[in-house]
Amino acid sequence: MKLSLLLTAALTAIAPLGAADWTQFRGPNGDGLSGETGVPVRMEPSSLTWSIALPGRGLSSPLILGDKVFVTAGSGARQDRLHVLCFRVTDGSLLWERQFWATGRTMTHEKIGAATPTPASDGKAIYAIFSSNDCVALDLDGRLLWFRGLGRDYPNASNSLGMSSSLVVVDGVVVAMVENDSESFTAGLDARTGVNRWKLDRPKKANWTSPVVFKSPGQPNRVLLQSAQGVTAVDPTTGKIAWDITEGASTVPSLVVSQGRLVIPANGITVVEPGAGDAKPKSIWRSAQLRPGTASPVVVGGRLLTLNDGGILTCADAQDGKRLWQLRLKGSFSATPVVAGGHLYCVSEEGRVQVVDPSKAEGIVVSELALEQTVIGTPSIAAGSLFVRSDSRLVRLGGTALR
């Protein structure tokens, strides 16, 4: 196996993840939900705690672990300078920054960039991947643990629009989806060393969805891989396929797990329920009326919400898919909504934060705040705050000192 650079090191033992940590795309459970309290419902200019400039563009969500917030960026005319930065949650001060040269293709669609995928953390390290298929592991103090140039190891693994699948880390394995029209695969990288634990050939079609960890009491963890062909569940430690759903799925918004069911964007929404062990999931319901755009669906309080690119927020009963209401939000949307305190936080591409109460007979916009910045990436929630990453800045809304 070719490694562009491989440094191995023992990972420093630290305390377990706190309940408020935001450790991957769409939060600790990959569903967009946070148990955090105190996030402002009434967004107003005074909600701005701090706003700091970033050295480059990116769509990746911030990760928050304790009093540290981590974010990636890409800079340079060719987006070939890759950055991982760490700031202090309380005041936004820079704690450290690490830079790397990209080894793979960095050209992307103008709307995205090199730092599109969201990193992941197991509480011991930050694992970041870029559109160039460069993957790096750093400890929480910024020390390099390992670096994989997957774009160099697998030079045909790219697409003309750019790669955007985020990482997950589970059972000591970092799962990277590198799915495209040519050399398409998903790999399980050893979290300690970056070496392949396994590599699974995948459908040869461009795919921008992200892997999702499926946990069931008393059962081994599974990683769900979504593609145009459907959803595949794999053992994260071996890459062995546990089961397949082959009825097709979206290649942009990712599925979400709620109450043991999979809510899959697939020409609308398809909901399935896995059986005992590795039995193939059974279909629960389908709806062509619920059509997410770029944003992934979210389920809160028994209600399923989808948001399309034009700002139409649709709410349905999560049990049967019956549509309850629709609400037009201001602006266009790429970011997935996130939830705290039963409220939906939606951030438009124009940087307008809109807080929605989805629990009533009709959706209600409780408050809104114009950041006047371009926002494509999904926000994060921790420390009583909403963290929004724009094209040029990282913003904290709400919260004071870390509790």
Language model features: what each stretch is:
Residues L17-R403:
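Noncatalytic, solvent-exposed loop/strand surfaces
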Residues S4-P16:
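Bacterial N-terminal signal peptides
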